């Protein structure tokens, strides 16, 4: 006799008198087990889906790998690294890396007549991959980022726009503190919404040249390099 058949018979009949258990009781027990398993499967699927969504958004904002100055870890202001064409080419030659882009950041503050909010201005160049942010763009368009022509257009999150009472096309005043206070007026070209508050409440996306000028850096100096996606990389 197989083990499964033995267990089934023990469940179906009482061990003392061989009296058959009522069919409704068996059906109720089976239904309870089925519902319990279904709830467990759904819960696991939701958790896996949530983890995957969070992972994709973290990578979309930050990338799989970032190369930055070690001093930037313990400092409010970012410290640059020198990234020339040769370094970009060398990184792009790795078959495991599908995309490489430069970026620079500058912490600052948005101020309106009614409110102010801390933020980080992230600048990207012409090699910027717009696919992630385009997926979550709810208004406007993504500016064209170029090495030769600088722009003061910026992408802002819907959460920040709502909090600061801003809309598409508005001029916003941003302030930055280093040796002295610097102010820049930016134009809202697009509004995105990822519903990932850790990033939506923090990042504004703009031109790499603009951020480099705010930092007082040379053209080949940037905060870092990020690989937006890769299949496998052995360090």
Protein language model regions, located:
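N-terminal Sec/SRP start-transfer signal
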Residues: 1-37
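Alpha-helical transmembrane segments
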Residues: 36-47
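Membrane-interface junction motifs in transport/secretion proteins
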Residues: 51-84
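Short aromatic/hydrophobic contact patches that present stacked aromatics
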Residues: 66, 153, 224-226
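Short beta-strand-to-loop capping motifs
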Residues: 69, 227-230
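A structural signal for hydrophobic secondary-structure junctions
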Residues: 80-81, 85-220
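Conserved small/polar residues in nucleotide/adenosyl-binding loops
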Residues: 231-235
């Amino acid at each position: 006799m197989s083990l499964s058949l033995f267990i089934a018979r023990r469940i179906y009949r009482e061990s003392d008198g061989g009296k058959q258990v009522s069919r409704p009781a068996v059906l109720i027990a089976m239904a309870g087990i089925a519902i319990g398993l279904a709830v467990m499967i759904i819960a696991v699927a939701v958790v896996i889906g949530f983890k995957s969504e969070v992972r994709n958004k973290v990578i979309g904002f930050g990338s799989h790998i970032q190369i930055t100055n070690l001093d930037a870890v313990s400092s409010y202001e970012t410290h640059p690294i020198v990234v020339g064409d040769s370094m970009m080419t060398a990184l792009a030659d790795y078959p495991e890396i599908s995309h490489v882009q430069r970026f620079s950041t500058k912490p600052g503050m948005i101020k309106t007549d009614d409110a102010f909010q801390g933020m980080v201005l992230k600048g990207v160049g012409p090699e910027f991959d717009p696919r992630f942010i385009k997926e979550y763009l709810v208004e406007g368009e993504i500016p064209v980022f170029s090495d030769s022509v600088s722009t003061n257009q910026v992408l802002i999150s819907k959460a920040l726009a709502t909090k600061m009472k801003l809309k598409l096309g508005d001029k916003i005043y941003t302030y930055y503190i280093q040796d002295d206070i610097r102010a820049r007026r930016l134009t809202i070209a697009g509004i995105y919404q990822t519903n990932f508050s850790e990033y939506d409440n923090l990042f504004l996306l703009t031109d790499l040249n603009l951020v480099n000028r705010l930092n007082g850096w040379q053209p080949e100096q940037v905060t870092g390099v990020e690989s937006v996606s890769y299949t496998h990389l052995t360090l």
